[in-house]
Amino acid sequence: PATRELILPVSVMGAMEALEGMSVTVNAGENPLTVTNNYTTGRYGQVGLSATGRLYQYTEQNAPSVDGYAAYLSELEKAVIWLDDASSEGNPATVLHARGGQPLSAANTLRTGDTINTITGVLDQRNEGYRVQTTEPADFQPTNNRPATIVDNQASLRLASFNLLNFWNGNGQV
């Protein structure tokens, strides 16, 4: 069967349901897909992507509101998809998804904010939503590079810590 196109964000979640189990090419229209979650990339080869750019906590841009937050989550669900390496292996020796279509490494990281134009694979639903299962490396572009090292001979840094686990006054009472 031919590969179907899935443009995010979808207007209704049924659009993804209708394509489940099919080969799809996912894009965000004229915008790139943005890396929003790389927490499980090294462990399971998964990358969270958004069609609406970098994601923020609801209250970072809005006043607290139960109804507003529910609407925000509903819209977010329509714009987010996971890229998966089609493997259930934990801590794989090679992680496919990093910058430039090369495997993940200490020298070739994947940062939130990096982008990709399209992803292609089989669409399925599990765990945290819809996923595109692919066995081909993704070609992420570095759009969120680490800041250059700041060289300032006048800079000073003072660190302080306090161990609250050992905080007692000696009389046996905490």
Feature map (PLM): residue ranges:
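Extended non-catalytic accessory segments flanking core domains
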Residues: 1-174
